[in-house]
């Protein structure tokens, strides 16, 4: 009996010590809720349904009372404010270019960059998309890429929207920081505000009167596209530099009528020959010290 009592006391003391250690060091514990709970691990993982400020309930005057007439009014306005079709936004990065001189006017596409843009144009043509809008950054390399693509797709050049909001820049300080690229804080403030304005201009759910799915082609830049992807998917925007996309690659995002956003392609360039796959400026034509 004495041995049994000693064993029980020892077991109890051991369990108590283990439990106290768990309380002191909870971060080492693996909880079942990590994989099995309906609640997200981090509150930031919750989807913001009104991210574009067009969630129907945010646009309609709230119920003033519970009278049937008021409820009918509210439900009718709510239905009228709902989007009914999806928007597809296809983002294309410019082709490889020459980084020579201090002016954008000298940053022409390389011969390889022109071939990349041609392959992308052919790929977009093969997809058989009827484009509702084509938008291009006002920087030379994006303009040249857009011109080459337009020769392959069914869209009039005169209808292209040239947008300065899409110009390349520093959208937000990246995490983790990198040593080889450290813009001044003023550049992040200037470029970040502009690029965010570009995101808000082009990323939103469809208007309620849109009667068919729409397709918008945007020809822009690597930093801007990566930032747009993070913002659209509600990932931490500071993670944009962890993504890598090739020159003239295709990124396809879809905004559903509910406001949910999904990604179909991210930096797709598999339609190009291997010798055309690039993502950096050729060092022999790059402005380096």
Curated annotation (Swiss-Prot):
Organism: Drosophila simulans (Fruit fly)
Transmembrane segments: 7-23
E.C. number(s) listed in UniProt: 3.1.3.16
UniProt enzyme class: hydrolase
Task of the protein: Displays phosphatase activity for serine/threonine residues, and dephosphorylates and activates Pk92B kinase. Has apparently no phosphoglycerate mutase activity.
Cellular compartments annotated: Mitochondrion outer membrane
Protein name in the entry: Serine/threonine-protein phosphatase Pgam5, mitochondrial
InterPro entries tied to this protein: His_Pase_superF_clade-1, His_PPase_superfam, Mito_Ser/Thr_phosphatase
């Amino acid at each position: 009996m004495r041995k049994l009592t000693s064993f029980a006391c020892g077991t109890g003391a051991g369990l108590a010590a283990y439990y106290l250690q768990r309380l002191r060091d909870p971060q080492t514990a693996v909880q079942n809720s990590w994989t099995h709970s309906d609640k997200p691990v981090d509150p930031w993982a919750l989807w913001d349904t009104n991210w574009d400020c067009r969630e129907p309930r945010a646009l309609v005057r709230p119920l003033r009372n519970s009278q049937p007439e008021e409820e009918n009014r509210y439900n009718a306005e709510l239905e009228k404010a709902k989007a009914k079709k999806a928007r597809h936004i296809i983002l294309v990065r410019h082709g490889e270019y020459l980084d020579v001189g201090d002016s954008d006017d000298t940053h022409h596409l390389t011969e390889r960059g022109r071939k990349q843009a041609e392959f992308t144009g052919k790929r977009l043509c093969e997809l058989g998309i009827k484009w509702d809008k084509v938008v291009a950054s006002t920087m030379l390399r994006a303009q040249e890429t857009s011109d080459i693509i337009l020769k392959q797709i069914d869209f009039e050049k005169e209808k292209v929207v040239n947008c300065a909001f899409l110009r390349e820049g520093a959208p937000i300080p990246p995490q983790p920081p990198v040593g080889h690229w450290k813009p001044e804080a003023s550049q992040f403030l200037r470029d970040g505000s502009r690029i965010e304005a570009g995101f808000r201009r082009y990323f939103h759910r469809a208007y309620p009167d849109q009667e068919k799915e729409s397709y918008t082609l945007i020809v822009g830049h690597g930093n801007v596209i990566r930032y747009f992807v993070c913002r659209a998917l509600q990932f931490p925007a500071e993670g944009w530099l962890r993504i890598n996309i090739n020159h003239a690659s295709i990124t396809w995002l879809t905004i559903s009528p509910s406001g949910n956003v999904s990604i179909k392609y991210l930096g797709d360039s598999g339609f190009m020959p291997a010798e055309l796959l690039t993502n950096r400026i050729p060092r022999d034509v790059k402005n380096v010290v």
